[in-house]
Amino acid sequence: MKKVLFYTQNRWAFGSIHHALAKELYKYGIIANLLDWTQQYSPEEIRLLNDTYDLFVTNPEAVVHLNRLGIPPNKLATVAHGQWDMLLARRDNGNIFYNEISKFGVVSNVLKEKASEFGIERVPDVVPFGIHFDLFYRKPSDNLTRIGYGGAKETKNFFDLEIKRGHLVKQTVEKIPGINLVEHGFYNWMCMPAYYNSVDAVVVSSIEESAGLPSMEAAAAGRLVLSTPVGYFAENGPAGGGIILPLGHPDESEFCSALTESLVFYQQNSDAYVQKCLDIQEFARENYDWSKHIASWVNFLS
């Protein structure tokens, strides 16, 4: 059996994705483990790991670090989860190493296009991620009163531009009587399935996403998903994954007006709200589970 080591962290999306991948890959004859990149490892540990594993998988910036520790290029694979990953690697190391390592992948077509824009000659494989649908499945709420953020409230991109815009969700929801915003911190990924019990809808207000776990998880949990057309939702939204909100950039009022209209409608029409949640959940069942996406990872890692 092929042995793969994900050099990653056990927090946020990285932990969620790589733990799930390790379970799924085993079904296809690939043994996968996780190595915490927040820890230091001795030269002897690196040597032993190199003798044990056939392939080391991490993001573009960390793959250079592994090479410096002694892992040879023919055992290195990188998968970019965001534009930031590729831009940091380019800033520190240029684009040459993409041609030297064994495999180069990205998690979405958005990033495949960005790789070309960034001057990376090697064409990456697209390896989208999924979720465990049954883990997130919940009965939809009976009515719409509680709104949650889809991901972080505030984040600036590589060019110092605010891309999450959680403040727009807050200022919009505060103006709608009977609807409350559920504030939350950065939860460990293992807390997220139960988190969706505390909200009736999830809003993604980003102007930039590479993929988008929150809209997938919320859909599987039977929550109303409202999102700008970013990441996976650019395709999944029109196909049945939720309600598409205008990007509202630079005119943020377009986003706020559309969000208000949708929330008020589903707040006042409970039957329509429940049916919409059920439709979104069924779309998630048919499209988001790891069983729909694991083949691309197996092919990539083999």
What positions do the PLM features span?
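N-terminal pre-catalytic "stem/leader" segment of glycosyltransferase-like enzymes
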Residues: M1-T58
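Acidic anion/phosphate-binding donor-loop and adjacent secondary structure
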Residues: L88-R90, S116-E117, G130-T145
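Conserved catalytic-core segment of nucleotide-activated headgroup transferases in glycan assembly
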Residues: F133, D142-W189
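Short alpha-helical donor nucleotide-sugar binding micro-motif in glycosyltransferases
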Residues: A194-V199
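Aromatic "clamp/platform" in nucleotide-sugar-dependent glycosyltransferases that forms part
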Residues: I207
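Short hydrophobic beta-strand element within catalytic cores of glycosyltransferases
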Residues: L224-S227, A234
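A charged, aromatic-enriched C-terminal amphipathic alpha-helix characteristic of glycosyltransferases
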Residues: Q267-L301
